[in-house]
Structure formats: structure tokens, C-alpha cells
């Protein structure tokens, strides 16, 4: 199994609105999605693309704000009130094959495979099995899912 490209970096934030201002004013981001709720995961999400060197899209940042105190992101923000890097996300061509491969390696998978913010199947790997980094594995978007939200 070979991982594909880095799709995005997830950043927990107490305020998507304040974070968007930061990414626009400090990082020069111009491509910002409309925030949307994912109640099944207890979060509000917004995608920000930093500009690339050629003027195209650079790195995509997924801003994640808790919808309530029951959200896992709320717990993250209790420890780190200003927010910060939450996870990295890599693409794979086949999510079921990737899951089986990581399970075969003895890596702990956090919960079932589910549909993520880009509209494609995802799962998360425990940071203790991934060199201290919470890692999201995402099936490479196809068709309508390419645009995300």
C-alpha cells in the first residue's frame, strides 16, 4: 500500500471566522469555502486554500470548530484553547484496501469508515501508532467530490 498525496492539514479552532481572517490577512488565502456543519461528527468545517507559488492552490487547511461541548474538538480546545494542528490527511485510491493494510500492520483505527467533509470515505489512525500524529486516510475524491464543499 502506498499513500497518495497530502490532501489537507486539519486545524482545530475556537472560531472559524477568526481563523479565516488570519489565513486571509497573514497567509494570503483567497480561496475559502463556506463553513458547513457536520452534526454527526460534532463539528463545523471550512476549507481554506493557501496560495501556491504559481498563483494556484497551495496547501489546503481544514478549519474545525466544535458544535458543542460533546465534540471531540471541544476536548482538544480545552487542552489547547487557541487551537492548533489536529491531524494530517493522506489520500488513497481504495479506502477498504487501505484500512485492511493498516489493520494488518496492527495500527489502531479510530471508529468505522465514514463519509468525511470532502464527501468521500475516511478513517483515522491512532496517533500513538503514527509517530504521534493523528492521521486521516481519505479515499481520493472523484467526480462531484473533487470540489469538496
Predicted features, each with a name:
Residues 1, 144-149:
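Basic/polar N-terminal segments that are highly enriched at the extreme N-terminus
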Residues 34-37, 72-79, 116, 147-149:
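Short, tandemly repeated low-complexity microdomains enriched for cysteine and small residues
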